[in-house]
């Protein structure tokens, strides 16, 4: 297994078919997301010595490109939480009812009205972030000597969120009204942490950023990686944490 940083925001991880077989994985496992796919991504990230600027990212997206003798996993980190004041999202109204286009237009207009030209410029970068990451994948593949048959790229996104108490975790879970591929709940000291995996298949390029912004209305940006949580925290719910917490009624 090899890792190469191809840009400030994107890593390329190459995994041979032999490595896949050793992990009990097959190419078909990536076509239909399941628990073993989730664990595969997490285990790969746990084993690698990630660059410092990737270790504290609250959002990582995964895109898998199968090849004849290997798979290439492209990992892209988002800077959304560092460049936008997400507390101001409350001023935009109920963004859960907005289309992606309306969300970005409303956010852009809000920034312009407040004279936040720097954030406005950054928004344009964020809106194109996933498209640029895809282009990096294409350029990397084109640069290889042996042309290979074009295959569909499979994408996932991984989040980590922080919460001050269990009540906040339950409230967050009850706001989720879209499919979650996998979720876990951890306790570390006095705080709680949740990991979430989403499938990006058949979604627009800005879907990951939109979902991240929606969830940050009810959660804090993650300050720990899943690898850290698994080693230093108590895992309260191992899988399907969101749906299990949604069953709790709060007075």
From Swiss-Prot:
Gene Ontology molecular function: any one: protein-macromolecule adaptor activity
Pfam family, one: MecA
Quaternary structure, from the entry: Homodimer.
Family that this chain belongs to: Belongs to the MecA family.
UniProt note: domains: The N-terminal domain probably binds unfolded/aggregated proteins; the C-terminal domain interacts with ClpC.
Function: Enables the recognition and targeting of unfolded and aggregated proteins to the ClpC protease or to other proteins involved in proteolysis.
Protein name (record): Adapter protein MecA
């Amino acid at each position: 297994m090899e890792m190469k940083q191809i840009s400030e925001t994107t890593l390329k991880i190459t995994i041979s078919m032999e490595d896949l077989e050793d992990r009990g994985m097959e190419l078909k496992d990536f076509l239909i997301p399941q628990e073993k796919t989730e664990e595969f991504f997490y285990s790969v990230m746990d084993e690698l010595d990630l660059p410092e600027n990737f270790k504290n990212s609250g959002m990582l997206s995964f895109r898998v490109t199968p090849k004849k003798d290997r798979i290439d996993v492209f990992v892209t980190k988002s800077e959304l939480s560092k460049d936008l004041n997400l507390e101001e999202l409350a001023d935009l109204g109920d963004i859960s009812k907005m289309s992606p286009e309306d969300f970005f237009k409303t956010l852009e207009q809000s920034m312009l009205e407040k004279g936040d030209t720097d954030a406005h410029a950054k928004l344009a970068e964020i809106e194109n972030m996933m498209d640029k990451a895809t282009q990096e994948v294409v350029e990397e593949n084109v640069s290889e000597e042996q042309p290979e048959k074009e295959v569909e790229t499979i994408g996932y996104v991984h989040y980590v969120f922080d919460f001050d108490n269990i009540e906040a975790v339950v409230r967050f879970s009850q706001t989720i009204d879209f499919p979650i591929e996998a979720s876990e709940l951890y306790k570390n000291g006095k705080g709680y942490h949740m990991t979430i995996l989403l499938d990006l298949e058949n979604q627009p390029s800005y879907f990951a950023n939109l979902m991240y912004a929606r969830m940050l209305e009810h959660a804090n940006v993650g300050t720990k990686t899943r690898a850290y949580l698994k080693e230093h925290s108590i895992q309260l719910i191992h899988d399907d944490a969101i749906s299990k917490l949604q069953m709790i009624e709060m007075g």
